[in-house]
């Protein structure tokens, strides 16, 4: 059984900053290399400023060409009535859901993009 690059990246994405730093140190020791340039360039700023985000906001940026399909997708995702969903879509950019987990946010984004919407996760 072989691990794909995508599986490795997914595993690293789920790690905390501390765990990533420990992984980098272990890789430096095992392979006899140094990641000093990469750490200095981006790691210092990222480590101090960015903590692992656990809650995300799903923002409808625009409805695109197929507004009816987007309204249906918004209704299904939010449980809003037809009038409320249409008002939300017409008022884009607008927050669809706030404080959701990453997996739910990604699934909602995929569903809405398949309907033709432009969606952002913040």
From Swiss-Prot:
This is Large ribosomal subunit protein bL12. GO terms for molecular function: mRNA binding; structural constituent of ribosome. Homodimer. Part of the ribosomal stalk of the 50S ribosomal subunit. Forms a multimeric L10(L12)X complex, where L10 forms an elongated spine to which 2 to 4 L12 dimers bind in a sequential fashion. Binds GTP-bound translation factors. The keyword Phosphoprotein does not apply. The keyword Transmembrane helix does not apply. Keywords: Ribonucleoprotein, Ribosomal protein. PANTHER family: 39S RIBOSOMAL PROTEIN L12, LARGE RIBOSOMAL SUBUNIT PROTEIN BL12M. One of its GO terms (cellular component) is cytosolic large ribosomal subunit. NCBIfam families: L12. It comes from Vibrio vulnificus (strain YJ016). It holds the Pfam family Ribosomal_L12. Forms part of the ribosomal stalk which helps the ribosome interact with GTP-bound translation factors. Is thus essential for accurate translation. Gene3D superfamilies: 3.30.1390.10, Single helix bin (1.20.5.710). GO terms for biological process: translation. Belongs to the bacterial ribosomal protein bL12 family.
